[in-house]
């Protein structure tokens, strides 16, 4: 699905065939003061702490609790015991709150309803971030004032672009020694390649950080009171920052002039825009994904969080301003997508974006895009065609809930008692719309798992539930070793599930050594003409398939890189056998001939064939296809691929040579390095196969002061010597089996 600006149709005829439901004045009134936002960042940028402050200042919680459970309570948004203990957010919790803003010009107060989704910052939980961004209209990108743009920040940035999510940036931890917001603003421009400018200037820095100067409305904002509850606004700008504030306001106008026509014209005519014109330009260019306003603050010191909340209301879009497209499944797949309208009286369209096993059965988080969802309604699952009743409708606050009777378009809610999978679309049955499925990355690591002692029903129950909740967590049985294999996005990802099994299902497990998910692919086109014949008395088997296989690039939208095409003309192969041929192709992809790993990046084109009136069957064509594929694969110059990871290491400067040396010994390619006052960051691309045991080595070589994060980048062909070793090892296993 594409959430974000779609290309503007040139003419009336090109408009997508959309049932044009017009938004009424009542719809506009309701939507104008509504925001669906996410909080995304690199791990440890202070994302959960910031969300905790937002909930406190909006009156949603009465006390502030810190992350890592220092006060034995833990942050509100981290509702799993495991999250509180490790101090990381694993699941995105969805929360609803209210925020009152004051119009600077008129002094009028206005109440906004905000849905916040707190997303995990750890790369192993990327799917949670993808799901959250998919249902948002805007996001807050949190950056650390010292570390700045880190590896996961660029991942989140890429995901925001994929789903077209406008963002405001918040530079947190302004109280930390070494905080330098201007370096971070430059990093946002250079590393994330989005025009950005600060809309605030700090009053004092590091432990002197007291407040901010609002560059748009030209005033000073301070926080007072023990928890920063009181916001004190002064029209006086402190003398110490006056020059800097003037320079940064000019910089803001210059940046806006490049992305906004109105400001650009004023700029060319040497006219200065007024405060309202600047604010309107920031809103326009942020929603158009051309600009990101940068706010500064310190969540842990309760400073400048409220002005950032005002920024959410002022600059991020409401549900009527973000474009949502759906597929009409009654039309051919090449038909243009249909635009949905957040009108309350339009036919219902909603997306289940997250599942949880609650105390009262399955809890399904849903965003309603169009129409109204009422308790007791009958709704249809677009994927399965099943009709279900909504027995209970709730609004979530992390893991507490309030019952509601109905929910309108543009809102996020949770429903009980509805069986479905993550990414399912629900309608009222009058339309055939489907929000296309989310982009799900392939797993890169797997390990065998078995329960200690006797296997209980809880073991399979847990695995089933985790697979339903998380599409990147896969389970299969290895046919040869009969072991249960779990696969995921990283060691921590799998570790968390093994740990959840112990806590939530009382099942202790033994795990095997982690294994890398190698793949196979082809590098050139190969033709095939294969006949499968078997005569065993009675009806035999006969099928002939002719065509070719060729390399295929992944689809940028869906990530799909295997495809089956049939261009058979005439009746050489009856159409009822084509699905069997397709099935045979997908079966052949499961195990490559080189190393026994799955095959990717391949298109199978069926051109011709032959059949026998008596001896041809679905089985015969399936077996013919498998045989044809294996024969063609030998001529298509197959190679083994391995996952390459983006690795980012942060360590004190004195260990720079040891860290670089350690990455070089693991065949890493250093792609970037940056030295700050007393620490440095190295970014490298390293094969996952060479990364085992790296955390211990890094701890040893940096006296425990270094830390690293890694994230899957892509698969690349292995070195010839490794390919030879893998092929030999696979051949040996085949000999043993014989």
From Swiss-Prot:
Keywords: Elongation factor, GTP-binding, Mitochondrion, Nucleotide-binding, Protein biosynthesis
Alphabetized CDD domains for the sequence: EF-G, EFG_III, EFG_mtEFG1_IV, mtEFG1_II_like
GO cellular component: mitochondrion
Subcellular locations according to the entry: Mitochondrion
Signal peptide: none
InterPro entries listed in its UniProt record: EFG_II, EFG_III, EFG_III/V, EFG_IV, EFG_V-like, EFTu-like_2, G_TR_CS, P-loop_NTPase
Known pathway: Protein biosynthesis; polypeptide chain elongation
Domain called tr-type G: residue spans: 32-320
GO BP terms, alphabetized: mitochondrial translational elongation
Binding positions for GTP per the UniProt entry: 41-48, 118-122, 172-175
PROSITE patterns, per database record: G_TR_1, G_TR_2
Keyword Ion transport: no
Cysteine disulfide links: none
Other remarks in the entry: This protein may be expected to contain an N-terminal transit peptide but none has been predicted.
PANTHER family: ELONGATION FACTOR G, MITOCHONDRIAL
This protein's name: Elongation factor G, mitochondrial
């Amino acid at each position: 699905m594409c959430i974000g600006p779609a290309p503007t149709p040139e003419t009336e005829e090109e408009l997508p065939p959309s049932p044009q439901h017009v938004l009424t004045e009542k719809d506009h009134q309701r939507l104008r003061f509504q925001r669906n936002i996410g909080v995304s960042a690199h791990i440890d940028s202070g994302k959960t702490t910031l969300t905790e402050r937002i909930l406190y200042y909006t009156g949603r919680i009465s006390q502030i609790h810190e992350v890592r459970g220092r006060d034995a309570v833990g942050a509100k948004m981290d509702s799993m015991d495991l999250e509180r203990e490790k101090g990381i957010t694993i699941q995105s919790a969805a929360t609803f709150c209210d925020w009152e803003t004051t119009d600077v010009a008129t002094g009028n107060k206005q109440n906004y309803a905000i849905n916040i989704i707190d997303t995990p910052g750890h790369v192993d939980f990327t799917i949670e971030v993808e799901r959250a961004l998919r249902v948002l209209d805007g996001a807050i990108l949190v950056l650390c004032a010292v570390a700045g743009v880190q590896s996961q920040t660029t991942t989140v940035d890429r995901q925001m672009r994929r789903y077209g999510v406008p963002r405001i940036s918040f530079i947190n931890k302004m109280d930390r020694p070494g905080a330098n917001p201007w370096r971070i603003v430059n990093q946002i421009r250079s590393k994330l390649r989005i025009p950005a400018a600060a809309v605030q200037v700090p009053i004092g820095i590091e432990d002197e950080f007291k407040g901010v100067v609002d560059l748009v409305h030209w005033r000073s904002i301070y926080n007072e009171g023990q928890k920063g509850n009181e916001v004190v606004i002064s029209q006086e700008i402190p003398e110490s920052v006056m020059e800097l504030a003037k320079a940064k306001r000019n910089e803001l106008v210059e940046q806006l002039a490049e992305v906004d026509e109105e400001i650009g014209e004023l700029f060319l005519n040497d006219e200065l825009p007024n405060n309202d014109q600047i604010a309107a330009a920031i809103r326009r260019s942020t929603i158009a994904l051309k600009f990101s306003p940068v706010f500064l603050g310190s969540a842990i010191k309760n400073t400048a969080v409220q002005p950032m909340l005002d920024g959410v209301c002022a600059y991020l879009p409401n549900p009527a301003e973000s474009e949502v497209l759906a597929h009409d499944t009654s039309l051919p797949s090449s038909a243009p997508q249909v635009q949905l309208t957040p009108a309350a009286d339009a036919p219902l369209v909603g997306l289940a974006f997250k599942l949880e096993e609650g105390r009262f059965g399955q809890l399904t988080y849903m965003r309603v895009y169009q129409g109204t969802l009422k308790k007791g309604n009958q709704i249809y699952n677009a994927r399965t065609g099943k009709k279900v009743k909504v027995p209970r409708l709730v609004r979530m606050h992390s893991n507490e809930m309030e019952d509601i009777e109905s929910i309108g378009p543009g809102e996020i809610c949770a429903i009980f008692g509805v069986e479905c999978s993550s990414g399912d679309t629900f309608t009222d049955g009058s339309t055939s719309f489907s929000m296309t499925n989310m982009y799900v990355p392939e797993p890169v690591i797997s390990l065998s798992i078995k329960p200690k002692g006797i296997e209980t029903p809880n073991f399979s129950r847990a695995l089933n539930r985790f697979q339903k909740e998380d599409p990147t967590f896969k389970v299969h049985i290895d046919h040869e070793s009969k072991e249960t294999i779990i696969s995921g996005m990283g060691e921590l990802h799998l570790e968390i599930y093994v740990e959840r099994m112990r806590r939530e299902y009382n099942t202790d497990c033994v795990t095997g050594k982690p294994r890398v998910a190698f793949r196979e692919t082809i590098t050139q086109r190969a033709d095939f003409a294969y006949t499968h014949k078997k005569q065993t008395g009675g009806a035999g088997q006969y099928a002939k398939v002719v065509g070719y296989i060729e390399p295929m690039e992944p689809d940028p939208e869906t990530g799909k890189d295997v495809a089956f095409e049939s261009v058979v003309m005439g009746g050489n192969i009856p159409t009822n056998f084509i699905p069997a041929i397709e099935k045979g192709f997908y079966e052949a992809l499961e195990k490559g001939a080189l190393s026994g790993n799955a095959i990717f990046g391949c298109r199978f084109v069926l051109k011709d064939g032959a059949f026998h009136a008596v001896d041809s069957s679905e089985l015969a064509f399936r077996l013919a296809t498998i045989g044809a594929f294996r024969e063609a694969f030998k001529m298509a110059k197959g190679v083994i691929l391995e996952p390459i990871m983006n690795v980012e290491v942060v360590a004190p400067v004195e260990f720079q040579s040891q860290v670089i040396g350690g990455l070089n010994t693991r065949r890493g390619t250093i792609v970037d390095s940056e030295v700050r006052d007393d620490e440095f960051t190295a970014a490298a691309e390293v094969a996952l196969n060479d990364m085992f045991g790296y955390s211990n080595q890094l701890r040893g070589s940096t006296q425990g002061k270094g830390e690293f994060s890694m994230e899957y980048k892509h698969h690349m062909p292995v070195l010839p010597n490794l390919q030879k070793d893998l092929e030999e090892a696979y051949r040996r296993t085949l000999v043993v089996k014989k």
